[in-house]
Swiss-Prot record:
The active site is at 1020 (nucleophile), 1140 (proton acceptor). It comes from Drosophila ananassae. This is Neuropathy target esterase sws. A motif (GXGXXG) lies at residues 991-996. Keywords: Developmental protein, Endoplasmic reticulum, Hydrolase, Lipid degradation, Lipid metabolism, Membrane, Neurogenesis, Phosphoprotein, Transmembrane, Transmembrane helix. Its main location: endoplasmic reticulum. The chain crosses the membrane at residues 35-55. Residues 356-374 have a biased composition (Low complexity).
């Protein structure tokens, strides 16, 4: 706020305008140019004091005279002199005793007339009450509690009790999945101990690669050998770590053991190594085939999540991960159309890190069968990024240059081609549209990706095809190279009419049989599942991230192109390019699509036909059926994937590690050697620094996709912090040696890291200067407020947790894909025994898959400490503790147990308030003080439907309709959703005196522009306006209160009465405090609807201070304490003196106190003393008048900063090296000379005070997270409060035009849009059906189903209370179907699931179908007799049982609790009838319904046991 023209006030009447303006100008000039006024004020004060003392003494003399006259009258009447008389001591004691007894009657509590020491106790109670009077009058303070030691320290348990060799063994083979104890003991029998001296080789080139090595003591160096004889270290293996390649493990199991070609391991010092031969696993797998299947699946998952995630997303390697150039198996099939393609295909593989690429001659060579069998052509179909992948690192223009290192004559089509034009039509829309029996298994598809399998020799197909395929003269086939003549018609682009399709199908069956490694006598197994299709150019087979169209494709003719999304979407958009880039081609004789068959992931590639092609394919469900009969094809599929990978991937497999960390375990510790970096695959990490004094402080937190320790590894410095796991986490470890080897071979890696580190350092520089003040809360550190998993815990049973979760889910859907999980959902999806220890691997894998597919996953806990609740605690990044704001704040036993179980997880409190109440949040401090473990709180205003008591069925039915509507982005649920996903929008209001009325107009413009406000911060007048908005959230009420306060500030006669002797300030601040206190009352910052902070200048600690809790009016007053006019506010917390925060940052208890503190203009109002610590607080504008940087540190992703402060004149006169005051006086008074602009002494002092504020303001203007706005209000003075309406209108008009221009320019989307508004596509949106984890061991080996037939009996009472079953059907779609709605129109988990999950497809004959339709219609109208309907239901149950038995013969049993779903189908028509005939007495109706459901469940248990589609009967 300005110091100049402080006493000037606008005239209240037109007839006094001239006089008041002249008087104000005169007074302002006197204040500016001389000190006479100060002396005059002092003299007036002394005269007033003397006058007051004189009249007070005169009044005392009068009273004394009257008393003497009265005494004289008494003496005269009594005839004696009473001057010497006095009270006796006994009379005095009696008098004072009676007075005390009268006061003792007011003491609370019963006075006992007997008992030892009762009088003493009564007196002590009375004294205690008197002593506590002042403490009770003080406002309630927030209790500051240091976080527990476990929050910042790693867990150290008794793991030393396990023998070291067994412990290291367990940790090393954990990468193969979960092993039962007998299996582990059998593996231990095959271990060998190797003792190596320094310099001894553990293994070297040409040694067989057939063992797993675990270092028990010492150190081993793993390095690669270059062609010139030099070596390059990959990693150093220390105690407890292992050396192995999972890709070699698959080679050994498939019967093709390899040897070390470039990798060598040598002991650095004396070491002891445990050797576990891979053959030991073969022996175990023979007796436990399910273990083999699970190990293969785990290896494939690791291949996706670790290798592809690390190498692609962070190092920028894409096409280098697969062998781009493959050779044909037969000379009759030569697809390349250019010499370079033929040449590159002869090389057969990518170069390794240490071996240069081979060159090819100009002659075309035919690959031999042996060589062709060596090089497999599968495709690694996914990169491990599941669902909505994290924002990838953008490749530069040089992303293709590394190919020239391995191929001197690269094919431009292969290397530098990007996709253009349309993406092509869908394969299932154009290719499969008119074919019968296409969608046989379409309804049963899960989320899987691409898989590579071995190719069969196409030349071997010709003898089986008869004379039709050996006719010469058919010419060149499409897609074949020039000079390739006489190709069989099957392998050409000849029209299908010229070829017998039966022969084509037979050829396709034989080829796919060989690819799957099946003998010839097993052709009948795959023959029914093989389909052949003709493709036109640019037809899309599958898109990246899609799981619906997953198949194994075999290319018979033509060419398929494999693309991947361009990671630098912004650069591609600027260059008008497509976001897809070519990875490689798939030629005739090769297969593609299938890694997800083993992992359950979606496709990471987009596959299109390059030209006219013919492909044979097998759908995913058919592959699983074949696996069930021939489990060994899993090895063939896995071996095909491995052989397709480039040697670079195999070398990286030796160095990259997959690390599992339980909650509390440390990744690395402070001061350790930095020899690697880590990639967070799942979970959450916390970085903690230990200061020399032993104090620990949080530096930051890392979530999924973040790099940890990269800066220290690159700079080769020791670890500066300790990083520990907040919850169970998975990480990929990238050693420094591997990183150096890759960057030497592929310079693109350096470009990637420079881009990554530049963004990280830029963010650090922008937030460094605005870190929290000393003594600030832990959460004030720059912690990433973006969570992947959220656990919801009710405080009491009265909390409507299910409706709350639905509302939060609804709001989160506006941001991205989200999933809601409950214990019933998980049981129905995976079985009732899923929470047992034996199913740990399956459960964690399934949950990890769901988390990867969604931006956020909601875990709804039970109301008791069940196994599911404990699992939610382990999986959660943050825990939301939900309570009723009007209820009791006491902590229950269940809540304390949660704090004990999740000691390190961040917890936030959510208080719910009904919309019908007119009250505002109150007593929030009592909630927070009772829960010191809570780091943040949210006030949520709930609609009426949340608190309406309904059965679970009615809740599901209600929200199935609510989800079809658009969420209200201005609601508290949307605000909470944006906070959880890191999309909060902050509003920062700067200081500027009366010009702050423009904030009201800007608030109205922001509201009309549809921009939600999630957080508010303010300084000086901005603190006042921001606090009004957070308290009211109604622009009309805010305008009214702001106008009333401005009118009070125009009453200059009240301010004159507040004048005081100007030692500290000109005004005492009493009247100013009263105006702010009357505006807010005794409201605390914690009780505001919207998170709020104000900033003040702490002159006690010489820093700015951020207030997020405490007295509102006090800190607002302190932030407005302009120096010289008001005294600093004394902080009651620590006694520090606080001034206007604008002195350090001019844009940023009880509410009014900190508002007052933020308005303490130095010199005008005294500093405000903080009641907590006694610090003196002044106006925040002295340090930061627009604290947008503070808002960014508190978690706001997008910020709108409004600046209304004054601007200094920078056009000053250059007067030379010295300055004479007499010369300035002459220039000032001489009208014939040009005026000079030289700052006077007060102006210089003001500019010095605002130095840091101006610097901070420039940083805010240049930041990328802030939208800086300055309305045109420079013509209004600081104290022009009488022009409130005019200034407000200026701000409104300017803001409205500003946001309209932003909308036209397309820049408004970041404030009100966070996702693509296009309608959701089924292939790209998360559905619980689509991403169900596929346990191959259970499918293939017929393991006992965890969801046995009696699972419906266990949960029969709950089936009608939860309608979230997501069940894929396994029935053919070429038959007639009837869609029966499930109970309650179950709420889906995504937009596309609303179509697929709500309806259950049943296959019925015509008669039953017609009867069911008739029955459903009659029930809906309430006109059908129960007996007739029950008879039809029995008929339907029999029909469903028959169909179930029929489909079970061809399909593997699903992991769904179908019986529970069947019960829901049975009850749904009855519940529809109940809704229409519902009696007013809802309570009795619900009791009758519960009894009827129990009766139905009991009868069902007797009637149907073990059936998968058993139905209930009344």
């Amino acid at each position: 706020m300005d110091v100049l023209e402080l006493l000037r006030a606008s005239a209240t009447g037109s007839y006094t305008a001239l006089f008041s303006d002249a008087w104000c100008q005169y007074v302002s000039k006197q204040i500016t140019n001389s000190m006479y006024l100060y002396c005059a004020l002092g003299v007036l004060s002394m005269v007033f004091l003397a006058w007051f003392m004189y009249f007070k003494r005169l009044a005392r003399i009068r009273l004394r005279d009257e008393a003497s006259r009265s005494m004289s009258a008494v003496n005269s009447s009594s005839g004696g002199d009473l001057r010497g008389l006095r009270f006796r001591k006994r009379d005095k004691m009696l008098f004072y005793g009676r007075r005390m007894l009268r006061k003792m009657k007011n003491v609370s509590g019963q006075m006992y007339s007997s008992g030892k020491g009762y009088k003493r106790r009564a007196v002590m109670r009375f004294a205690r009450r008197i002593l506590q009077l002042r403490r009770d009058n003080m406002p309630l303070e927030m209790r500051t509690v240091e976080p527990p030691a476990e929050y910042l320290e790693e867990t150290i348990d008794g793991s030393d009790r396990v023998p070291p060799d067994a412990l290291y063994m367990l940790q090393s083979i954990r990468i193969f999945g979960h092993f039962e104890k007998p299996v582990f003991l059998r593996l231990c029998k095959h271990t060998q101990l190797l003792e190596l001296m320094a310099g001894d080789y553990l293994f070297k080139i040409t040694d067989p690669d057939d063992s797993v090595y675990i270092v028990q003591s010492g150190m081993i160096n793993v390095y690669i050998s270059n062609a010139d004889g030099s070596t390059l270290s990959l990693k150093t293996v220390r105690k407890g770590e292992s050396v192995t390649s999972l890709l070699s493990f698959i080679d050994v199991l498939s019967g093709n053991p390899s040897y070390y070609k470039t990798v060598t391991a040598k002991a650095i010092e004396k070491s002891v190594v445990i050797r576990l031969p891979m053959e030991a696993f073969e022996e175990v797998f023979q007796d436990n085939p399910d273990v083999m299947i699970r190990v293969i699946q785990v290896i494939m998952i690791r291949l996706q999540r670790v290798l592809f995630t690390a190498l692609r997303n962070y190092l920028g390697l894409n096409a280098e991960l697969v062998q781009n150039h493959m050779r044909f198996k037969s000379s009759t099939i030569m697809a390349p159309s250019t010499h370079s393609s033929q040449c590159s295909r002869q090389t057969g593989s990518q170069p390794t890190l240490g071996v240069p690429a081979p060159t090819c001659s100009n002659t075309t060579t035919t690959a031999s069968p042996t060589t062709a069998n060596t090089v497999h052509s599968g495709l690694a179909g996914a990169n491990g990024v599941i669902g909505q992948s994290r924002p990838p690192i953008s490749p530069s223009r040089h992303s293709r240059e590394e190919h020239t290192l391995s191929d001197p004559n690269p094919n431009p089509d292969v290397i530098n081609t990007s996709v253009g034009g349309a993406s092509g039509t869908s394969m299932y829309a154009e290719v499969h549209g008119d074919a019968p029996n296409v969608d046989v298994f379409h309804q049963q598809q899960h989320s899987v990706g691409n898989l590579s399998t071995r190719r069969g020799s196409i030349s071997q197909m010709a003898p089986d095809l008869g004379p039709a395929l050996s006719q010469p003269g058919l010419g060149q086939g499409q897609g074949l190279g020039p000079g390739v003549t006489g190709a069989p018609p099957l392998m050409t682009g000849a029209p299908a009419s010229k070829i017998d399709m039966r022969l084509v199908h037979a050829s396709a069956v034989d080829s796919l049989r060989k690819e799957l490694g099946l003998p010839e006598e097993d052709s009948h197994i795959i023959e029914p599942f093989v389909e052949v299709r003709e493709l036109e150019p640019n037809v899309t087979l599958i898109t990246e991230g899609n799981s619906d169209d997953v198949c194994v494709w075999f290319v018979m003719t033509g060419t398929l192109a494999v693309y991947q999304a361009n990671q630098d979407a912004a650069r591609a958009k600027q260059q008008q390019e497509k976001n897809d880039m070519l990875i490689h081609f798939v030629h005739p004789g090769e297969i593609v699509g299938g890694l997800a068959m083993l992992t359950g992931e979606a496709s990471a590639y987009t596959i299109r036909s390059r030209n006219n092609s013919r492909v044979a394919f097998i759908r995913r469900a058919a592959i699983y059926q074949i696996m069930r009969q021939r489990p060994r094809i899993v090895l063939d599929l896995g071996n095909g994937v491995v052989r397709r990978l480039s040697p670079l991937v195999r070398q990286c497999d030796y160095a990259l590690d997959w690390i599992f960390l339980e909650s509390g375990r440390a990744v690395y510790r402070q001061d350790e050697i930095s020899d690697s970096t880590y990639i967070v695959l799942s979970g959450r990490m916390r970085s903690v620094i230990t200061h020399p004094g032993g104090k620990k402080e949080i530096i930051g937190e890392y979530g999924k996709g973040d790099l940890v320790g990269i800066v220290e590894m690159i700079t080769e410095t020791s670890r500066t912090t300790t990083v520990l796991a907040v919850r169970d986490s998975e990480l990929a470890k990238l050693p420094e040696g591997l990183f150096n080897a890759i960057k030497l071979r592929y310079p693109i890696v350096v470009t990637k890291l420079i881009s990554f580190l530049s963004h990280r350092f830029l963010g650090t520089m922008q937030t460094r200067s605005s870190s929290a003040a000393p003594g600030g809360p832990v959460e004030a550190n720059p912690v990433t407020h973006k969570y992947s998993t959220v656990a919801l815990v009710p405080i009491t049973d009265e909390v409507p947790l299910t409706p709350f979760t639905y509302e939060l889910y609804h709001s989160l859907c506006a941001i991205g894909p989200v999933l809601r999980l409950t214990s019933d959902v998980v049981r129905k999806q995976l079985g009732p025994n899923i929470f047992e220890a034996a199913n740990e691997y399956r459960l964690t894998s399934w949950l990890a898959q769901q988390e990867d597919r969604n931006i956020i996953t909601l875990y709804q806990c039970d109301n008791a400490l069940s196994a599911w609740t404990q699992r939610c605690m382990r999986q959660a990044d943050v825990i939301l503790i939900v309570g009723l704001g009007n209820g009791s704040h006491l902590v229950g036993k269940f809540e304390r147990e949660i704090d004990r179980l999740a000691m390190r997880t961040q917890k936030e409190l959510v208080l719910l308030y009904p919309e019908t109440t007119n009250s505002k949040p109150a007593n929030t401090l009592s909630w927070l003080n009772a829960r010191p473990w809570v780091t943040k709180h949210h006030h949520v205003l709930c609609v009426k439907r949340i608190f309406t008591r309904k059965s679970q069925y009615r809740i599901n039915d209600l929200y199935s309709r609510v989800l079809l509507s658009e969420p209200n982005m201005h609601s508290d649920f949307s605000r909470l959703a944006r906070w959880l996903t890191g999309n909060s929008i902050g509003l920062v209001l700067g200081g500027g005196g009366a010009r702050g009325a423009a904030h009201i107009g800007m608030l109205k413009a922001i509201q009309e522009a549809g921009i939600p406000i999630d957080m508010v911060g303010g300084v000086s007048i901005g603190a006042l306006m921001g606090a009004l908005w957070c308290s009211e959230r109604n622009i009309t009420t805010v305008t009214q209160k702001a106008r009333e306060w401005s009118k009070k500030m125009t009453k200059w006669f009240l301010q004159l009465l507040d004048l005081t002797y100007p030692i500290t300030s000109m005004f005492s601040g009493r009247e100013f405090n009263k105006t702010i206190h009357d505006t807010f009352g005794d409201v605390s910052i914690e009780d505001l609807w919207i998170p709020y902070f104000t900033l003040t200048t702490d002159i006690t600690a010489s820093c700015h201070r951020i207030h997020t809790n405490g007295s509102l009016w006090r800190y607002v007053r302190s932030s407005m304490s302009l120096s010289g006019y008001m005294p600093p506010l004394c902080d009651p917390k620590d006694g520090h003196l606080l001034l206007d925060g604008g002195y350090v940052n001019n844009l940023p208890g009880q509410l009014w106190r900190y508002c007052r503190a933020s308005m303490s203009i130095a010199g005008v109002f005294p500093p405000f003393c903080d009641y907590r610590d006694g610090h003196l607080l002044l106006d925040g504008c002295y340090t930061n008048n627009v604290p947008a940087d503070v808002m960014h540190n508190l978690g706001a992703a997008h910020i709108i900063a409004i600046d209304v402060g004054s601007q200094d004149d920078t056009d000053l006169t250059n007067y030379g090296d010295d300055l004479s005051g007499w010369w300035l006086l002459y220039k000032k008074w001489n009208p014939f000379t040009s005026p000079v602009k030289v700052p006077d002494l007060p102006d210089i002092q003001s500019r010095l005070a605002y130095v840091s504020c101006v610097r901070q303001l420039e940083e805010v203007k240049n930041s990328d997270y802030c939208e800086y706005i300055r309305p045109p209000i420079d013509k209004y003075k600081t104290l022009a409060f009488g022009s409130f309406d005019e200034i407000r209108d200026v701000g409104y008009v300017f803001g409205k035009n500003y946001f309209e221009n932003m909308a036209k320019a397309g820049r408004l989307g970041r404030f009100n849009q966070w996702f693509n508004k296009e309608p959701p596509k089924r292939g790209n949106h998360a559905s619980l059906n689509e991403y169900t984890f596929i346990d191959l061991a259970q499918i293939v080996c017929r393991l006992p189903e965890t969801n046995a037939g009696n699972s419906a009996d266990i949960f029969s009472e709950d089936e009608d209370c939860d309608g979230y079953i997501s069940e894929p059907t396994t029935l053919n779609t070429d038959r007639r179907r009837i869609q029966v709605p499930r109970a309650g129109n179950s709420l889906s988990f995504s937009e596309n699931e609303m179509d697929s999950d709500v309806e259950l497809d049943l296959q019925l004959d015509r008669k039953t179908e017609k009867s069911i339709h008739s029955a459903a219609t009659s029930v809906a109208r309430g006109s059908m007799r129960s007996r007739e309907f029950h008879k039809l239901e029995q008929d339907r149950s029999v029909e469903i049982t028959r169909l179930k038995d029929e489909t079970e013969r061809i399909m593997a049993p699903t992991n769904l609790d179908r019986k529970g779903d069947g019960q829901e189908q049975e009850k749904e028509p009855e519940q529809e009838q109940e809704l229409e005939t519902e009696e007013p007495n809802q309570e009795n109706t619900e009791v009758e319904e519960e009894q009827r459901n129990q009766g139905e469940g009991n009868e069902d248990n007797k009637e149907n046991k073990g059936g998968a589609y058993n139905e209930t009967k009344n």
